[in-house]
């Protein structure tokens, strides 16, 4: 989870995958933040990149009293998983692999998670496991401006331009009722903690 050093504060951004985190990191840089705990690879020593550490691991690296501010952005769990599917589907297409339906991909991915919770660089792990308690949480559905604007005000900085990075496609994905129920069960803690309604069929 990246740290950003400003001249007056040290900020910890809990980067939940597929919630606009790359755009927020770019905005924090534009405000003058210097990043740390941010890498494109695991550097050969870890099971996921540092920006995607779950809360339990994060606490061993960065104690709570080390920084001045902590926030995260969350997303409806089903919407987040659909976004992940679209990204993986595009990757399969580039590699010339056969396309999977969303239902088949979810079933395969949840089985892979059982064997390795770090699958896809910790992208599948529930948001509730990534975000420590007492973290200030914003919803992607309310716009990234809400999160970045709040941080900017507290730092006494101007609101930066918010770039759209890695924006996904808008094509619809069919989510059968059985798959929706499986998603709701897998992410039950996310639905409960962050107040999202369970998906239809869930």
Predicted regions and their residues:
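Membrane-interface amphipathic segments in extracytoplasmic regions
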Residues: 1-202
